[in-house]
Amino acid sequence: MSSYQQEFARAVAVQNIEYLRRAYAKATDLIGLADQESVQAGRQIYHRIFSADTEFTISGEGTDAMRASGPDGWVDVVAEALAPLGPTQHLIGTQLVEILSLDLDANGSPHSGQAQMESYVQAWHEMGDGQVWLFLGTYFDEISFYPEAGWQIDKMVLHRVAGEN
């Protein structure tokens, strides 16, 4: 396999990994709508982008530390946190992916891999009193490639940087 093919495979991997966080933002906003159909749609996305045993942590000044395991555990945390609020919009900014390993088959398709990703988030939350609560944070993810599922997040840490309302 040529070095060009290897670099192409790495570029595709980076793009696929970045899209995990973008899909997460969409799923989280759906769950925040708090109706059964939207929560189920968000849950389906979470099951696609997270491995079955993903570990989740939220930390940072002014934030209650939270932990959960697995996509369904995280749906419960998100639904409880966002249900009292109005609509939300999670905007994903700067994304940096580092491919730690990427093993390709003879056709140039991945069959295993490890990566890390850092992503900025601005999350806007409508409050019941017409105010908007702004959460600024950084996601730190550990990601693996699974032949049956593709790239999935195995560990997610959300660290709050700042916020206001």
Describe the function of each predicted region.
Residues 1-48:
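Short, low-complexity N-terminal intrinsically disordered segments enriched in polar/charged residues
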Residues 3-7, 83-165:
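A beta-strand edge to alpha-helix "cap/lid" segment located at domain peripheries
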Residues 40-120:
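A solvent-exposed, acidic/Ser-Thr-rich amphipathic alpha-helical stretch
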